[in-house]
Structures are given as structure tokens and as C-alpha cells.
Amino acid sequence: MADFSPHHSLLLKATAAGAAIATTNDPNISSFFLYNHSHGSQAPQPANAAAAAIVEDASLESSVSAVLDTSPSVDRKRKAAEDSAHSKDSCKDGKSRRGKKASKEVEEKSTTEDEPPKGYIHVRARRGQATDSHSLAERVRRERISERMRMLQALVPGCDKVTGKALILDEIINYVQSLQNQVEFLSMRIASMSPVLYGFGMDSDGLHDQKIGGMFQEALAMPNPVLNQSSPAPSQAIMDTTSTTSYSLQSQHGAISFSQDNGSYLMQAVGEPRQQEMLNQLVFNNMCSFQ
């Protein structure tokens, strides 16, 4: 222990530093430390300078390694940005393609809907109407019925202003009933005139064409003054015949004149006032009983 001088402590420190730096594999530094170890305390100051230089080299290496470590991160960021840009472009392309496909499909559907298939009658149905064959036949039948209704509506006076099939049918029924009543009234009036024919000595079968024609021929054989007789209060009756001339007859109680208009005979009975009053009363009673 007495052999060591105060400089031996520096040598020990130098040897320790040399052992620590030996891992750097620098031949110059190792030779320098070996030189210091061999010469002892002759150069302690250069050893401290070498240690400082080693520390600076280590800091430089650490900074270089840090720079080298940061460079891959920048590359990664660039790659990520490029990948995101590519992904956005691909998404846009995909959307555009999908939009084009959808537009093409819509156009194809519209063309197929506009063009009806061959061998099929295209009918645009209204609301509540079908397009099958049965429904088409039903539509045709209803159109024919509506045409007939319009014809009936034109025949009935005052029916053009009525709207609705039910109301139109009611108007037509009322009009037909009124016509039926008029026909019945006329038939009753003609039937009421048959006793008048009996009163003048005429047979009930005298309404036939042959007998009336014979009476007209007899009337033609009479002189003109008799044919021209007239009366201020005539009574009339209608009888259907086929003759086309006008005649005048004379009986015991007065004169009877016949005239024809479009296939119908008009009879005028000219006689005493009493018979005329009875005839008018009979016609009036028949009219009242009918009403």
C-alpha cells in the first residue's frame, strides 16, 4: 500500500474509463489508454480530453441515430397520405361507376315501360278499373249502356238538365207513365162515343172499312145542298180508317159529316140541340170518370 503514490488514483480512474470505452472498438483510443497505463502519471490531462471527445462522439452518434430514426416516420406519413389519397380516388371512382349503373338501369326500365310488349293490347286504365279481358268487355258494355241512356235522355223533354243515372231513369219513367195515361184517356174517349153511333142508327160494326166506304158512296149520290148543311155546335170523334175523301151524311135527326186527315176520320154530328147537349154531357162524364 505504501508503494502507491497519489497519482495511482488517477491511473485507476483512467483504467476504469479505458475499460468503459473499450466497447467502442476504437484502436486509437485503446492504444492511447494502454500508453497511459504503461507510463503512469506522465500524461493525465490528455486522458481527460480524450474522455470529453468520447462523450462528444457518443452525443453525435445519438443525434445521428435520432435523425435516422425520425426519417422512417416521415416516410411512413408520406405513404399513409398517399394511401389515403388513393383510397379517396378509388371511392370516388366507385361512386361514379355506381351512379352510372343506376342511371343506366333507370333508363332501361323507362324504355321497357314505355314500349308495350308485342301481341298485347296496351290499355291505360283509370282509377278503379282493371286491364284484363273480362274488365275490358265490361267497360265496352257500360259504354253501350251509357249511349242508350243518352238517347233516352234526348227523347224525354227537359231531361238534359238532369245529372245522375237514377234521376234520369226517374224522369224517363214519369214521362212514359204520362204517355200511358194519355193513351188510356183517348181510348176511353173513343169507347164513350160508341153509344152515339148507336143513336144515329149505325151498327157497332160500322167502324169497319167496308161499311164506312159504302156509307160514303151513298153520301156522294146525294144532292149538293144537303152536303153543304152545317151546325154551330158540333161534336167530334176519331176513328182509324184508310179512306182519303171527305163525306157528309144526313139522317132523320140531322146531318153527319166525315172528313179524313192522315188516315183518321173526324165525325161531326149535326142535329137537334137536345141531342147535342146529351152528347156533350156524356163526353164530359167520361172525362171526369177517367180523371
Swiss-Prot record:
Motif (Nuclear localization signal): 125-132
Biased composition (Basic and acidic residues): 80-117
InterPro entries: bHLH_dom, bHLH_ZIP_TF, HLH_DNA-bd_sf
Top-level taxon: Eukaryota
Keyword Membrane: no
Location of the bHLH domain: 129-179
Region entry Basic motif, spans: 129-142
Gene Ontology molecular-function annotations: DNA-binding transcription factor activity; protein dimerization activity
GO biological process, one term: positive regulation of gibberellin biosynthetic process
Tissue expr: Mostly expressed in panicles and stems and, at low levels, in leaves, lamina joints and roots.
Keywords: Gibberellin signaling pathway, Nucleus, Transcription, Transcription regulation
Keyword Hydrolase: no
Entry GO terms, CC: nucleus
Subunit structure: Homodimer. Interacts with IBH1, BC1 and LO9-177.
Family designation: Belongs to the bHLH protein family.
Function (record text): Together with BCL2, positive regulator of cell elongation at least partially through increased gibberellic acid (GA) biosynthesis.
Protein name (database record): Basic helix-loop-helix protein 80
Naturally occurring in which organism (per UniProt): Oryza sativa subsp. japonica (Rice)
Phylogenetic classification of the source organism: Eukaryota, Viridiplantae, Streptophyta, Embryophyta, Tracheophyta
Record gene name: BCL1
